[in-house]
Amino acid sequence: MLDLRKTLILLVLLPVFCIPAHAQRPDSFWRKVVHLISDPSMELDTGAVYQPAPRWSVAVSGELHQAGTSMENKLDYVFTPDDGAGGDSELLDASSSIRLMGGVDKVIGLQVGYGNLSLGWNHIVGGDRASTNTSFSFDYLAPGYALQLQYFDFRRPIDYEMKIALGHDWGYMEDSGKTEKPGRMTTFIADAFYAFNRRTFAYSAVYKGNVIQRRSAGTWLFGVKYLQGLVEYDPDDVLSDLWFGMYRQDTRQVSFGGGFSYNLVPFHRQPGADGKGLRNLTFNLTAIPMVTLFNQFSSTMRREMEEGDPVLVKNVINGKLHVNYVFKAGAIYSWDRFFVGVSGSYDRYNYRGSTAVPEDFSDDEVEFGRIYTSGRFCRWSASLKLGVKF
């Protein structure tokens, strides 16, 4: 993730801070690039979408954010009593459900942008003092195209709920609490959207504020999403006792889908010749069902040995096709050079598969078969943003 963070920063710094300076030279390569960045769509109907000259913008934001995962497991195993009586073996199964969730974080943020580009940084305030947070975002939001990169790294105690049915006559266990040591929850998301109606609809009008939607319009969207998620906690913590010392879960997914986005404009007042007097209120609702074509889940387990160091075992599950969901809603009010926006989003990513339990985990009484795993990563956020254009 460290290399990913450096790459993300370079992606933003080069176009945002270098291009505007070089763009002053006539007919230069950089001038063509900045034109593509700041005014990528020459098909805009100016009666429906008002795109002012590109400007620098600065926005501060407050956000509520929560991310977590829930997982269900089923384990097949053969139990042979080791009581000297020669009892018959039994084919049994055990099951568990685990829910890991970070708390609702209060986040402050700063976004700096030029034209359709912006770089964001967020930081958790208040809450658990053991929490640490790194959150970066890079957005390229044009009227008809969108590319958004988000990276979250939260380290904090993890709330858990677990239910375990062991099979045979070993009973049932239920527990909930918080890990003693901070766990880590990391997410990298890359979203790309293409709007089929690029003449009268501007996706960036609500979520970037760089253009103004003059009248209501909607469009069908095509979207691509990449997700890489990680949940990790201390191997000596209570959670690692659940399933063979499992203390780390990773998922990687690539999804494609189509949906619909609509901008509703209940009020608009055009600016005067001096550029002042702009008043605009726009609402957006976006829904994109997606099919996950690449769906990989891996778990890392630690096996304590009677002698020597613990053994680490990593199992990789290549899951089946799944339907995931992306929902987003927002509103923005613009007046002259200022704007205030609210937005909310909900992302859900499913995974499912099975893997064989390593032979080292079996003993004289218990021979393990396969673990069947299904689960989901979820993330929601709600934010308020206040910005100004220079």
Functional labels for PLM-detected ranges:
Residues 45, 137-252:
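Outer-membrane pore/translocation modules
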Residues 52-58, 106, 115-117, 134, ...:
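Outer-envelope beta-barrel architecture signal
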Residues 25-29, 37-55, 141, 197-218, ...:
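Short loop/turn motifs that connect adjacent beta-strands in outer-membrane beta-barrel proteins
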Residues 73, 77-95, 233-337, 346-355, ...:
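Outer-membrane beta-barrel transmembrane domain signature
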Residues 93-96, 122, 133, 173-181, ...:
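Extracellular loop and loop/strand-boundary signature of outer-membrane beta-barrel proteins
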Residues 190-192, 376-390:
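Outer-membrane beta-barrel "beta-signal"
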